Amino acid sequence: MANMQGLVERLERAVSRLESLSAESHRPPGNCGEVNGVIGGVAPSVEAFDKLMDSMVAEFLKNSRILAGDVETHAEMVHSAFQAQRAFLLMASQYQQPHENDVAALLKPISEKIQEIQTFRERNRGSNMFNHLSAVSESIPALGWIAVSPKPGPYVKEMNDAATFYTNRVLKDYKHSDLRHVDWVKSYLNIWSELQAYIKEHHTTGLTWSKTGPVASTVSAFSVLSSGPGLPPPPPPPPPPGPPPLLENEGKKEESSPSRSALFAQLNQGEAITKGLRHVTDDQKTYKNPSLRAQGGQTRSPTKSHTPSPTSPKSYPSQKHAPVLELEGKKWRVEYQEDRNDLVISETELKQVAYIFKCEKSTLQIKGKVNSIIIDNCKKLGLVFDNVVGIVEVINSQDIQIQVMGRVPTISINKTEGCHIYLSEDALDCEIVSAKSSEMNILIPQDGDYREFPIPEQFKTAWDGSKLITEPAEIMA
């Protein structure tokens, strides 16, 4: 019996060994079956990103579907962009860092998703959820952290700060009326906070590439990028024969080899190659025959057909938009006005807002009392208004002049070069909030005229032992 028991144990060990050898023989060559030490799975960094998507991104998507409409559509695009990033991170965990020339091509799927999200916002400026769309559009470039080194985390934070400018508007509009929007804001900002924590743990100084495996390229990484961001796949089966496109390319190479051989044979003739040239007589030389020069000028014209077609995307002229001045719901839309100094909005109500977009060299007067006014992407615009009960905002603009005839509690200036504000006697208690702007001046009425006061652009900060103290810097002339 003892001998029989020993024989059985030996057989079991032999079977186990054969099974392990069989598994090894079916593993694809190289390190494709092993990802950073995890056989048949994904790297810890990819697993952590999956958790971020399953929690924060999923929560944001759920809250966006509750709001529906443009917000839901936009959120689906964000989800798709995160899926593209997940595919890129999976590739980075399996391949070594690519050559510099291949980086742009590998990043293209993510950059296209970002562009799609930003384009959607631009096409829906009349949306009631425009602040929601803007918050996403301004911060979605944070997904470009994978190309930032040595500190991608602060880059994501900067993009997150850009989102808060618009999420604060959402909170201001809905915090007392519809808490669904408040939940939406929290879930969206949580994405970037968690992404910063993820980067700090797994990619502190920049995207971490695999130390083993082939070098990433557009060809070698195609299967990973096109596999989608689904659940981690099982261990791959034995690799099939090479794909047909490669065989076609090889066939083309074989077909072209005789022509290449003939070309090299001609080049190898050296000076003997000139023996095949035909002698040119004087009557065939253009510098001795004026009639040939005239013909030569004509014969060069067909080469113009080789110039890029005007239908190529790069040669499209900038699209000319039709000017707009209309009331849409409770929003006055003033868009794409140029060289107009007679724009007037006279029939206004307290709940109405005015949105002024991409107007140049124009003047607009708003009579009565409105809720708020936004000036966005305008140049050399003059605005005169009576009363605003909320806020006047100037964003991404240049050379703006604002004259307050009545009252306004707050004027906000952000990312603007050149803004001159003429206050009335009733508006002297107005608060001016500025960020990332220059050449700002407030003009105060005094003795029938205006006195100009510049808004500080330079500050000094010091530690007083318990907190930071910031005050305008005095620049001595």
From Swiss-Prot:
UniProt xrefs under Pfam families: CAP_C, CAP_N, CAP_N-CM
Entries under InterPro entries matching the protein: Adenylate_cyclase-assoc_CAP, Adenylate_cyclase-assoc_CAP_C, Adenylate_cyclase-assoc_CAP_N, C-CAP_CF_C-like, CAP/MinC_C, CAP_C_sf, CAP_CS_C, CAP_CS_N
Protein's cellular compartments: Cell membrane
Modified residues (Phosphoserine): S301, S309
Residues covered by the C-CAP/cofactor C-like domain: 317-455
Key words, A-Z: Acetylation, Cell membrane, Membrane, Phosphoprotein
GO terms, biological process: actin filament organization; cAMP-mediated signaling; cell morphogenesis
Official protein name in the record: Adenylyl cyclase-associated protein 2
Function: Involved in the regulation of actin polymerization.
Family: Belongs to the CAP family.
Regions of compositional bias (Pro residues) in chain numbering: 230-246
GO terms for cellular component: cytoplasm; plasma membrane
GO molecular function: actin binding; adenylate cyclase binding
Residue numbers of N-acetylalanine PTMs: A2
Record field: compositional bias (Low complexity): 301-320
Topological relation to the membrane, as annotated: Peripheral membrane protein
Spans annotated as Disordered: 224-261, 274-323
